[in-house]
């Protein structure tokens, strides 16, 4: 699934709508999406939204749409 994550660059500065940024990512579920962002960035997550159907198509048609991939390690012992 593809998720849209709205965030602030860090957790220290008070959130302001004008400085909210967006990233798009793939994850199995919303819990995994949040965990990946929290483990790999200092971002203050405001909202995570699953994109499907027309919402996904709309976002993909914009120039800013680019999937962010975090280094994932699959350790199966």
From Swiss-Prot:
The keyword rRNA-binding does not apply. GO terms for cellular component: DNA-directed RNA polymerase complex. Keywords: DNA-directed RNA polymerase, Nucleotidyltransferase, Transcription, Transferase. Its EC number is 2.7.7.6. Gene3D superfamilies: RNAP, epsilon subunit-like. One of its GO terms (molecular function) is DNA-directed RNA polymerase activity. The keyword Transferase applies. GO terms for biological process: DNA-templated transcription. A non-essential component of RNA polymerase (RNAP). This is DNA-directed RNA polymerase subunit epsilon.
């Amino acid at each position: 699934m593809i998720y849209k994550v709205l965030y602030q660059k860090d957790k220290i500065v008070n959130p302001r709508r004008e400085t909210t940024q967006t990233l798009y990512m793939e994850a199995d579920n919303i819990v995994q999406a949040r965990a990946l962002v929290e483990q790999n960035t200092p971002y203050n997550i405001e909202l995570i939204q699953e994109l499907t159907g027309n919402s996904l198509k709309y976002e993909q048609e914009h120039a800013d749409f680019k999937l962010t991939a975090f280094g994932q390690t699959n350790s199966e012992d």
